Amino acid sequence: DLEIEFGINLFSRKGNQLMLTVEGEALYKKAVYILQYCDELQADCSSTLRVRPPVHIGIPPMLSTVFFPELLEAFQAEHPEIPVVLEEYGSVRACSLVQDDTLDFALVNMEQYNIDKFNNIILADDQIVFCVSKDHPLAQKESVTTQEMSKEKLIFFNADSVQNQLLKLRFELDGCTPSIIMKSSQIYTTLQFIKSKKYGCFFYSCMTDKFSGVVGIPLATPIRVKIGVVWKKGKFISNDMQTLLN
């Protein structure tokens, strides 16, 4: 429609591929500028409103237990005028929602193939550990192999969890099949299963001290992960968002 309206070719068509022409590139850059200007205008207007739009942050269930309770409480004590809404999603889904502007930020496991699409701040370098009841037969081991874990009844997180993908790949590379009896994003439910002494799950090592009666066993071949905050490249950062980043 734009090509007809302006009488120019915006795309170069070769087979099933579309590429921007010189005119198309110029129009694209101007469109990006206009959209950013609209975002800035909206932010300026929002700052004068009595009700400010909240900053939307995506956070996986596991990470919400470690990072955000204290951080959010401290931030809101210092900046009570800035509303913040936390929304629970796995890291994969959270990144997708940041990309389409549904979320402003997301706290995620950064071991994803497309993580370079986002701006990021790394908050922690951690590892995945195998978690069992302190009375489980494996609880005293210094490390646990994939073969040993494959003999246990396992609880994995949901499909939109990066941790899930990393673990499945590890089992596959080691020629083992995990015995997954449940997939859940609910920490409390998972802990109840673990405390029955019959099941195992996978948490980040920084989490285990927060749960009584649970032991985190390092994997024989560690799976290390970086945890950080991501936001969309090229996105206009409002004053409230910048304050939160700072």
At which residue positions do the language-model features occur?
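A short LG(V/I)-centered, amphipathic sequence patch enriched
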Residues: 3-20
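Alpha-helical linker/hinge and terminal dimerization helices associated
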Residues: 5-6, 27-49
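Short amphipathic alpha-helical coupling segments at ligand-binding clamshell hinges
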Residues: 23, 27-30, 67, 71, ...
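Central regulatory/effector-binding core of bacterial HTH transcription factors
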Residues: 52-113, 184
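Hydrophobic hinge/microswitch elements
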Residues: 90-91, 95-102, 109, 162-215
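Beta-alpha-beta core module
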Residues: 115-121, 126, 188-235
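Flexible hinge/capping segments at coil-to-helix
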Residues: 117-128, 132-154, 238-242
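Secondary-structure junction motif
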Residues: 139, 152-174, 237-245
